[in-house]
């Protein structure tokens, strides 16, 4: 992810509120890492900082994070548009010719990316992800990501909002796969 300066007042509170909303909406699809966002339930050392943490933090389960961003695109924009212009494909998925920038795709597509420590993440094919983490896990994360995107996009559409694309991060807590990080 490329870092941007924070010029949005209360950005942390807004992102936390949005993530809590989406976690609730999609909880029947996949469990998540949230323990609580109520600072009164945080461990004592953290409660001393309640004023700074309230509304802008979450206490979460520790996980082993899968080292890929699970990107779902419903529209052809951003880096997907750039790839399509060059190759007619996005992350190895060939798309119909003649699509226009930001056009709705016939079906949402799963386009994973590596998690870069600095700079922008690198788009990869599903096959490249499968080589790194296994075909079974890749298939499961693809199914979960597409299901979450569809549910969120359908809900947002009822509110006049279009979700062009989004990314999800997943982790392992024991044998369980859970959704981690901020959502949508």
Give residue spans per PLM region.
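Acidic/polar, glycine-anchored loop/turn motif associated with catalytic or activation segments
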Residues: 1-165, 171-184
């Amino acid at each position: 992810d490329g870092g941007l300066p924070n010029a949005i007042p209360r950005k942390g509170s807004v992102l936390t509120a949005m993530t809590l909303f989406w976690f609730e909406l999609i909880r029947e699809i996949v469990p998540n890492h949230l323990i609580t966002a109520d600072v009164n339930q945080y461990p004592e050392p953290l409660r001393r900082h309640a004023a700074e943490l309230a509304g802008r933090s979450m206490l979460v389960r520790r996980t082993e994070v899968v080292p890929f961003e699970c990107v779902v695109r419903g529209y052809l924009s951003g880096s997907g548009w750039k790839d399509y212009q060059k190759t007619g494909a996005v992350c190895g998925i060939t798309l119909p010719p003649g699509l226009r920038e930001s056009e709705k795709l016939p079906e949402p597509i799963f386009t994973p990316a590596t998690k870069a420590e600095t700079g922008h993440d690198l788009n990869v094919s599903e096959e490249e992800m499968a080589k790194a983490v296994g075909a079974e896990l890749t298939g499961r994360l693809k199914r979960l990501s597409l299901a979450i995107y569809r549910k969120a996009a359908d809900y947002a559409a009822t509110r006049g909002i279009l979700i062009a694309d989004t990314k999800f991060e997943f982790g392992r807590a024991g044998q369980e796969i859970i959704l981690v990080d901020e959502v949508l």
